[in-house]
């Protein structure tokens, strides 16, 4: 996952992390764990993030999925 790209999209939408978490229905502590790599976003969370940030399919793939298949 590209944490910096996701953070950039949040900023582009004029949101604080707290406001974003509220809009996406994710607790701040859960968001922090996922951003640090301790756990992964679920499909449902990714769907809510896509909606909250109005992400295109390309942007979604760029943020959440690896460039290479291993």
Can you describe what each PLM-predicted range is?
Residues 12, 23, 38-41:
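Helix-turn-helix/winged-helix DNA-binding modules
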Residues 27, 38, 67:
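The DNA-recognition helices of helix-turn-helix-type DNA-binding domains
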Residues 8-13, 51, 57-70:
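Short, charged recognition helix plus adjacent turn
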Residues 7, 18, 47:
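Residues within the helices of the helix-turn-helix
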Residues 14-33:
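Short alpha-helical DNA-recognition segment
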Residues 38-50:
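Short, basic-rich loop-to-helix N-cap that marks the start of a DNA-contacting helix
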